[in-house]
Amino acid sequence: MKKILLLFIQLLSILSVDAQLKKMPAYPLITHDPYFSIWTVNDKLNERSTSHWTGAEQSLIGLIKVDNITYRFLGDIQNPTETIVPFGEGNPTDCLYTETDPGADWMINSFNDKSWQTGKMPFGKGWGNDAATPWKSKSIWVRRNFNLTDLDIEKLILQLRHDDDVEVYINSKLAYSCKDCSVGSIKEYAINDSIKKTLKKENNILAIHCINPRGYAWVDAGLGKQKKPKALTKAEQLSVNVTATQTTYTFKCGGVGLTVNFLSPLIASDLDLLSRPISYIDFNVESKDGKPHQTEITFAVSGDIAKNERKQLVKITNGQQEGVKYLKSGVEGQKILGKSGDDVRIDWGYAWLASANPQNILSVSSTKKMIAASEGRILNETGSEENQQQFMTSSIKLNIAKNKKSSSTVMLGYDDLYSIQYFEKNLEPWWKKLHGSMENLLNQASKDYPQILTKCNEFDKQLFDDAVKAGGNEYAELCVAAYRQSLAAHKLVRGENDEVLFPQKENFSNGSIWTVDVTYPSAPLSLVYNPVLLKGMVEPIIQYSESGKWTKPFPSHDLGTYPLANGQTYPEDMPVEEAGNMILLTAAICKADKNIAFAKKHWETLSRWVEFLVKDGLDPANQLCTDDFAGHLARNANLSMKAIAGIGAYAQMAAEMGDKQKAGNYYSIAKQYASKWINMADEGDHFALTFDKKGTWSQKYNLVWDKLLGLNLFPQSVYDKEVAYYITKQNEFGLPLDSRKTYTKSDWVMWTATLANNQKDFQTLIHPIYKYLTQTTSRVPLSDWHETTNGKQVGMQARSVVGGYFIKMLEYKWLTK
């Protein structure tokens, strides 16, 4: 009987581990920080090149030769692009332009453009002010006449950089367009053959319309051509499975089964492990047909992961320390911390490919050599490899007997040398003091791999099981999808006094560092797994005020533009938003710590902020809140609710410090404000968006802290009324943010759902978000801002705010478990 029971328990354990996530908009492969973050946006691993979260290509390639037949299981390989119509960056190009609407036929070849101005691409403002021609209006139309010496073009490539929305025509035909989009560097897009056929030797027209509704502006374009590679044999992908720390694929390669596992060991409770910028890629081969096989696995990493722009040159060197061989790749002529901004990638420090297996051969390859290898041949030609990608390559032969297995593991890491600048001082990553050098870290990481794999397997199972208990299977899968993405939008840095600093980058929503209203939605993940990380997000903002560098009576919005944290760079404040956020986050830290010390340390600053909330929080003036994409809003009921909860949280902390008089005073104010709020916002069967606009509604996600902190400011009837109303307002892919638009923020939906007092209503509210996760056609790292009618991304992606999905787990931990 005991044996049967033990077998049953083991079976349940296996089922639990396997019951993870099979479908995502994009799949995390290598995820550590905002600069070291590689994804695939296809369900099949070998359908497309891998990319950085920004969409810039950062190619990983995997090939397996089985008995002299080569299969590609990872990434894609394209021939180098040869420029045929140069873009303007670095060599401005002549064209015609107008900033006045030219009418409907402006893109037609025969259009009369004689009244247009002469200028040079690129056009723009901002972005370092290095545009050839300034562009400051809302729209620009550009026409460029070009000739071609050769029409032998196998594959036509559009080379384009735009900020923001753009439409591009070639010889009167639409070649490319996108809305609510921008890119910060030249990117390449394959153009279909029907447009290629319109090309002629003389008088072709490239016509572009770009709009600039906000912020910086840029447009630059050219054309290139590629030779089409030979049709390659692809491994047959059988499955993909995502857990909190791992993404695993299985393939059929003739008579051999191949399993590839990407492990980024982001264990939030283990600062040493969390800070290590090293992922493990494990290859396991197994005979599936009862026969012995000779196999050879090649894994290649493009030098692009160490540069921001294609034109930058990288240098690859090799070495060995103890039993670990390595290659490292970095840009020549580096400037450490030399770039800041949103759509940018790192171009300082070094990418490392390493192996402790003596049979593993590490070498440097070019694009042409990789294509030759994928075709099962050796490249004999010599000559210039200029403009080709350079690859760090690992190859190993694994011979397997019939019905047997064999495996090999490589490590891919990144040493950024210095991670951020913190008030003019360059700071190293957390791991540097512990391990000294990347060589030392790689050796330690190699030795630790068996224990790390076990630890990650156990953590993945525990996270999933806890999430199922908190909110059900769909909720658990949402948490799995959010975990790595949220943590990898941060960087764990050591302060000058050994303090933990955990800044995040505001990915594709401004590029700011230490944004308070990004920390606020991200916080639940850290509160569940390691509140020390939340302190590393919150305390620098407090210290900015305490230093005297920030003198306003409310907190700053941010500390700069990633990775430079030298003071706020966002052009507008969010007074009530950030004051409420900081007080609520401090109270949450104290609850998680079961200790009031953190608040006590900064009590004077918190007291100044709560006075601001008392004065300005009940009925907020016209101002931005965290949902700044929706614009300024006065008399915002949800923002008022945040202020009221913040005042109540301050009272709670005062009580824990033994100051009964202050606690009573502020709790009384919060209760009075809550009562007034109910009267001002009441719309009968729900509460309004603003106090002065009838017939409106909004998600009151800020109410969740009244529940989680046990403030008891609002009666249960407020929760019940709002939740019941929300259920009537849902669309196919979620509950809209409010009555103004049909888009939503999925992190806020998760908070709103947690207001429900039963699992049925909670799951009813999150199910459309699960549907969005698994059915959206927007193939990018999970966007938290999407359209509820069609499930498409509106903007923003790969942000840390999906850590807010863990709010239900936080409720389970604090109020249920």
What is each stretch, according to the model?
Residues 20-28, 37-38, 78-108, 206, ...:
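Acidic/polar, glycine-enriched structural segments that form the non-catalytic walls/loops
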Residues 38-42, 62-66, 251, 282-288, ...:
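Well-ordered alpha-helical scaffold segments within catalytic/enzyme domains
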Residues 55-81, 101-102, 165, 227-235, ...:
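Carboxylate/His-rich catalytic cores and anion/metal-binding grooves
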Residues 116, 138, 146-172, 206-208:
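Aromatic-lined ligand-binding clefts that engage carbohydrates, nucleic acids, or primary amines
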Residues 161, 167-224:
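Beta-strand-rich ligand-recognition modules
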Residues 305-306, 486-494, 531-552, 591, ...:
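Long, well-ordered core segments of solenoidal/helical folds
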Residues 323-377, 506-518, 524-531, 550, ...:
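Extended ligand-binding clefts on enzyme/binding-domain cores
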Residues 437-452, 511-620, 636-654:
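Aromatic-rich carbohydrate-recognition surfaces in CAZymes
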